[in-house]
Design a protein with these regions (language model features):
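Glycosyltransferase-associated regions of secretory-pathway enzymes
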Residues: 1-65, 81-175
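Small-residue hinge/turn detector
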Residues: 66-78
Length: 175
């Protein structure tokens, strides 16, 4: 069973913007029985692996969150949302069905370079939300993938740059 806790990451020590506050309010509205936990520099070791340490050093906090979300759910289980995700209805039916992941479909039926895994017109988009029990093997697999990666600053034109969306989709398609 997925624990009743919603996790989100907020690195960089800046205040939450109005959109994030609005989205978090929607989580409270539609998932009132859930604890909401913010992860930041005070409760997550940004130096846990070289990838996150370098991303944090370069102030690319979203990339720190990419690894952190896997680590957090592996340790504690629960649901992860990016701070721009608004919940618009109760999710009891989805959560009761077990582990879940958000996904996107290319509306044109074609891959958009850099956004989707090669050969697929859909992508797992974990920032949209995903829920898992602690210690799920897929979480460990993703932690291992990131542990072996070097963080490199994305080029100015990131249309081809590989992101968490592509890494996750490719890992699932290999299963």
């Amino acid at each position: 069973m997925i624990p009743k806790i919603i996790h989100y990451c907020w690195f960089g020590r800046n205040p939450l913007p109005p959109l994030a506050q609005k989205c978090i309010a929607s989580w409270r509205k539609y998932l009132p029985d859930y604890e909401i936990k913010e992860w930041n520099e005070d409760n997550f070791n940004v130096n846990i692996i070289p990838y996150t340490a370098e991303a944090y050093r370069q102030k690319k906090y979203a990339f720190v969150s990419d690894y952190a979300r896997f680590w957090i759910l592996h340790q504690f289980g629960g649901i992860y949302f990016d701070t721009d995700v608004e919940v618009i209805r109760p999710m009891d039916d989805i959560i009761a069905a077990g582990n879940f992941m958000g996904f996107e479909i290319d509306p044109d039926g074609e891959n958009t370079p850099g956004r989707y895994a090669p050969r697929y017109c859909f992508s797992v988009a974990l920032g949209l939300g995903f829920g898992m029990e602690a210690s799920h093997p897929f979480l460990k697999k993703m932690l291992d993938i990131y542990a072996g990666m070097k963080f490199e600053l994305p080029p100015e034109d990131i249309s081809w740059y590989k992101t968490i969306v592509a890494y996750t989709t490719e890992a699932l398609c290999k299963e």
